[in-house]
Swiss-Prot record:
Belongs to the universal ribosomal protein uS14 family. The keyword Phosphoprotein does not apply. GO terms for cellular component: cytoplasm; small ribosomal subunit. It comes from Dinoroseobacter shibae (strain DSM 16493 / NCIMB 14021 / DFL 12). The gene is rpsN. This is Small ribosomal subunit protein uS14. PANTHER family: 30S RIBOSOMAL PROTEIN S14, SMALL RIBOSOMAL SUBUNIT PROTEIN US14M.
Amino acid sequence: MAKKAMIEREKKRQKLVAKYAAKRAALKEIANDDSKPMEERFKARLKLAELPRNSSATRLHNRCQLTGRPHAYYRKLKISRIALRDLGSAGQIPGLVKSSW
């Protein structure tokens, strides 16, 4: 299981991304608009750079909801392969059966 600090750090990043999403989108739109003057676009880029680093969506990392594991993550189920195997073996995921041939 991942350290609790790492899980909490990721939750904090998710909150920051949600908080600044609208502001970041507006600044990006201004900065990428070719019809605006160059100076205004540059100021928008500077304001974008002043936002917290963790408010960017690219800083997020997918983690398992049960264990916090960052690798081997299934997006559809939001759990890792290990948690999937454990839940599948316990019969808690409908339609998932162990294959045998």
